[in-house]
Amino acid sequence: MKRFTAFVALVLLAAATAVSCSKDKDAGKLAFDRPAVFLQPGGTATVGFSSTDIKSYSISSKPVGWDDAIVLDEGAMSVRITAPTVFEDDARADEGTEEEEKAERSGTLTLAGTSFGGKRVTATLFVSVSKTVDMSDRPANSYLVNGRECNYTFDAMHKGDGQSALATASVDIVWQSKTNLIQYLSLDDGKVSFYVGADEDEDDRIDEGNALIGAYDADGTLIWSWHVWAADYDPDPDADGGSVVVFNGYTMMNRNLGALANGNETTDEILASYGLYYQWGRKDPFIGPSTYRADNGSSASMYNAKSGTVKLESVESDAETGTADYAVQHPLEYITGTADSDYDWAWSHDGALWGESKTVNDPCPYGWRVAPSEAFEGLTISGTPAAADYDKFGWTLTDGTSQSFFVGAGRRRYDNGTILNIYNPVPAEAQSRNTATEAQPWEGLYWTSDAGSGAQSPAFYFWFEKKTSGGSVEYDVPYARANGMQVRCVRGK
């Protein structure tokens, strides 16, 4: 009886497997070779597609006004696309052009296929008449992009120095600060290609945020990554007091690296003024806090390409984890300092990771580098500190001629990677039980490019003290390199 039961079970399993395989075969598969195509008005591109068990194809939908612009070639398994020349948002479209001839600038093309089993499957391709900005001639570890509804590309086959070769086989989003910030990411002819849209509420502005794009080798190992800083901000103009400020002869961005604002008029503006945090000498950033007070250690949310959540982890420094190579391959790991590492994330201390000249690990965009301590020397608080500054989370600092707001963003702790933004001026041994009454609301810590000595490097440091309604500024205070701090970029000299 047992043998008969086993035989029946085996037959049923085989039948179920056959049905499953049959269903998979009946469904068929269909996919474009790339997720998107970007064209100029009147431009043409051919995009291939692949299929399994499909007997016929058709274009089932396309953007308005692209009716005659798309030609399906079943034999070549490709679609030829010609971009329209007159668009519904174009001023020329109102000059005698029939309404039905006006085209959308962007939209989705849907290719439908019918399988041999009679099932219908589809594949989609984003088509857009939009500007393509090629940044391949500006190699760096971070790219500032500020144009809405643009396609951006950069070299994927070299590190941020533009010299060291990479065996990049694929690219993917390591993390992004909002879902769908980076769209239609692909590796095309050795270049990273992606699209950034417009802000949902203000469609004349870029969709702002931060992301990290990773390069992977043929085995799927992460071998490099690049920070994309999408912001309505352009530091290229030379106007002091505008998008840049000049301190001690250094032209400096007037906001932190990765920040989406630079001010403290509202709590939203304070939060947007937080940039990203960096461990000294590492090129990859760590996201900012979830709230402007940043006193509970919570990070803002991060997402992958499929809108799933991504988490930051911490790992203690040792001979294996405390290396530059490990840091590159694990950008989502905060390498904490220990007594054995002298509270440096790098097990063997390396003062050359950042420096006076832009290094392969420098996190700033092309033409910019981490500010040295000399750039902050002599800065003082503009105006007279007052009790109302308790909620301002930063100072406007000046050298007597120029000035810039610096947010008090605290730091990521060297021992666990959480965000800490409480300044406690009283030595620990002298504190009473009620230490919260002594804790000050915020402090500012910014890494400099100076190597310092041993396991410590100089940081630019300022704070607010509520007991005296005052504050102070120091430009080169030694801190353990495992701390994560904000960064200001200066033009390379």
Regions found by a protein language model. Give the residues of each.
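C-terminal, surface-exposed recognition/capping segments
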Residues: 259, 336-493
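GGW-centered surface loops in extracellular recognition modules
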Residues: 134-165, 215, 220-274
